[in-house]
Structure formats: structure tokens, C-alpha cells
Design a protein with these regions (language model features):
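ATP-dependent adenylation/pyrophosphate-handling site
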Residues: 19-67, 71
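A conserved beta-strand->alpha-helix junction
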Residues: 45-46, 62-97, 105, 118, ...
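Short catalytic/ligand-binding loop motif for oxyanion handling, primarily in non-cytosolic enzymes
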Residues: 30-33, 88, 131-135, 140, ...
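Active-site adenylate/phosphate-handling loop in enzymes that bind or generate adenylated species
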Residues: 110-172, 176, 257-277
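Adenosyl-5′-phosphate
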Residues: 113, 120-122, 173-349
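Phosphate/ATP-binding catalytic cores across multiple sugar-kinase/actin-like superfamilies
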Residues: 1-21, 114-118, 248, 252-256
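Short beta-strand segments
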Residues: 22-25, 46-51, 79-81, 124-128, ...
Length: 349
């Protein structure tokens, strides 16, 4: 059932009267899509990999393994390389295309640009596989945190006091948001917010005008809405899948794919985010411990994926934004990038 559902979704998303390709990394999602697409008999399927000069030859360089996958399935493959100075040159255009602030989409912006330069007008993406097949670290970390701290829930109202006292010490060794462990970590919605947020609610008044932060948080009522997303679902995997799909994938990943693709007049299609696919695999996803994981997805192609792909630990699509935007004395990584994006939209970095 799973193999047929995946194959049908990929086949349906290949239908077009313009050139179509596949974004190919060394991850299970895109390699599975490329393999299934090759099975359809599409004449000389085109695949594209984005490489970063900073990673060339290192553990985060996916180009060689992606090339191995392309050779196995006989695709017309291209690798496009990008450097930090190209990011700097395109930064203004990237932020302009963004429409509204986001910390993601950098990788999609550049791979979409490369695809358009290669003559593609449609590209298939592996977006959605992590949410569907439970492969984010959050699927393990969120239930574990809520389970371990759950007995302390009666003390959660005191979490704000503890957080204020512990914040300077926590900030010295890790992200400041983890000062809120007791305040947020005793429930699944709170643990998810703690795991996924870049900045926690109490930090926003230092980024936005305090009144705006206060009113926005009151209107959003984040924990209540996160809890409402779960409804009466009790299975930990399904709980996290709902949260990741509704809050991270829908609000960030899909929106970022849309603006990043449209910036280059490229349509990005997502075979793993498909209502018919979800209908067909929903009974499998509700099977508890027997629910299919990424390995089951990767077993779908008739011609099996290379062993190096199957054995490769999950790394995500790594972009060297941390190095590209690093500023002396400032926050690094996505928190630093978020402040720069906010400043570009009229805020204060």
C-alpha cells in the first residue's frame, strides 16, 4: 500500500507540459522521489543538486552522494555550486522576495535559482517527508521531555521565577530559551514550543516594541492553540506530526518554498504533501509502533537506494548561513539571521 501510494503521488506530480526536474540531495526524501520518478519512464529525468563551496569535500557536502544516486537511476544530473559572496550579492533580492520575515528559505531560494538557470520550470521537492514519517529529532525529544517533566506540572506556575533567576547562567552555556524548561517543558505543546522556537515569548519584548509583543502574544495565545491542534490525539508520534505539519511545515516550509520558487518563476511541487497520499497512508500512520518510518519510505523504489544513502545519518539540508552572516560579538546561527531579517523589515537588529 505504501509503495503504491508514494509511486502514484510522484507520478501525478510529474505531469506537466514544461520541463520538470527533481531537487536531489543525499537525503532519503529526495532520493526516494528521484528513484520513483525514474521508474515512471520519464524521458531522461533531470535532477539538480546545490553544493556549497564551504562544505566541498567535507562531511556536509552532499554532492558526491547525490551524483551516485543520479548515476544509479540514469538521470540527467547537474550540480550547482554557491559561495558566500554570492549569498552577499543576492541578499537584498532574497529579502525582497521573502515578502514577510522568515528564517528559512535560503537554500530553496538558491536551488530554485539554479533550477531556473538550468531551464526547469517545475521541480519536485522532498518537503514533507520528515513530518509524515516522523524523522525530526522533535519526534523523540518532545514526548520525552514532556514525559520526564510532566510530574512537575504543578510547579509550572513557578517556572517564570526560576527562568528569571537561571537565564544568565543558561545563556552562558546554551540557547537562552532553555531557561524556560520548567515553565514550558511539562506538556507536549509547551515542550514543542521550547524545541521549535528560536525565541521564546519572554524574549520578544527585547526584539519587538514591548506593547506589540504583549498584544501579539495575548492574541496568538500560543500554548492554547498548540493544544487545540492536538485535539484528542494521544499517540506521541501523531501529536508531534500534527504540530510539525500545522505549525512548522504549513506556516514556514511551504510558504518559504512558495516565495523562493516564485522569485525565479519556478513551480515547486511536493509529492509528500498530498491529500490523496495522506488519505491512503493514514491507516498505516495510525498503527502505533508499526507505523512506517523513513526506512519504509526508502524501500518503496523497486531499484533500491544506494547503501551509503540508507546508512547516512540524518543531517537535514545544511546551509552555511552561520558562516555567511557571522558578525563579531553578535548572535550566530539562525537567531542572528532572524535579527538581521527582522532589521531588514524595519525592526531593530
Amino acid at each position: 500500500m505504501l509503495r503504491a501510494a508514494l509511486a502514484d503521488s510522484v507520478s501525478d506530480h510529474l505531469i506537466a507540459d514544461v520541463p520538470v526536474g527533481v531537487f536531489l540531495s543525499a537525503g532519503l526524501d529526495s532520493t526516494t522521489i528521484a528513484a520513483l520518478a525514474a521508474e515512471t519512464g520519464t524521458a531522461r529525468l533531470r535532477t539538480l543538486t546545490l553544493g556549497f563551496e564551504e562544505f566541498r569535500g567535507g562531511p556536509n557536502d552532499e554532492t558526491a552522494l547525490a551524483g551516485e544516486v543520479a548515476a544509479l537511476y540514469a538521470t540527467a544530473h547537474e550540480t550547482r555550486w554557491i559561495r558566500g559572496d554570492e549569498f552577499a550579492a543576492a541578499r537584498a533580492a532574497l529579502l525582497d522576495a521573502m515578502d514577510q520575515p522568515s528564517v528559512d528559505g535560503v537554500n530553496t531560494f538558491f536551488v530554485a535559482r539554479a533550477a531556473r538557470q538550468a531551464g526547469l520550470k517545475v521541480a519536485l521537492s522532498g518537503l514533507g517527508g520528515d513530518e509524515l514519517f516522523a524523522s525530526y529529532p522533535s519526534f523523540r525529544q518532545v514526548p520525552l521531555l514532556a514525559r520526564r517533566l510532566g510530574p512537575l506540572r504543578p510547579l509550572a506556575p513557578l517556572g517564570g521565577v526560576l527562568r528569571a533567576l537561571a537565564a544568565p547562567l543558561v545563556a552562558a552555556v546554551t540557547s537562552p530559551k532553555y531557561a524556560g524548561l520548567l515553565e514550558y517543558g511539562t506538556s507536549v505543546p509547551g515542550a514543542y514550543l521550547l524545541r521549535r522556537s528560536l525565541f521564546m515569548p519572554w524574549e520578544l519584548a527585547g526584539i519587538l516594541p514591548p506593547e506589540m509583543a504583549r498584544d501579539g502574544l495575548a492574541e496568538l495565545d500560543t500554548l492554547t492553540r498548540l493544544g487545540a491542534t492536538l485535539g484528542d490525539v494521544a499517540d506521541p508520534r501523531l501529536q508531534v506530526s500534527l504540530l510539525e505539519s500545522a505549525w512548522y511545515m504549513r506556516n514556514q516550509l511551504l510558504r518559504d518554498a512558495d516565495w523562493a520558487g516564485m522569485a525565479h518563476s519556478l513551480e515547486i511541487r511536493t509529492p509528500l504533501v498530498d491529500i490523496e497520499l495522506l488519505r491512503r497512508v493514514a491507516p498505516l500512520l495510525a498503527a502505533g509502533a508499526a507505523a512506517p518510518d523513513k526506512r519504509a519510505m526508502a524501500d518503496a523504489p523497486r531499484r533500491k537506494l544506494p547503501g551509503a544513502v540508507l546508512a547516512r545519518p540524518k543531517t537535514g539540508f545544511v546551509v552555511p548561513v552561520r558562516d555567511w552572516i557571522a558578525a563579531p560579538g553578535g548572535e550566530r546561527g539562525l537567531r542572528g539571521w532572524a535579527r538581521q531579517v527582522h532589521a531588514a523589515f524595519g525592526g531593530v537588529a
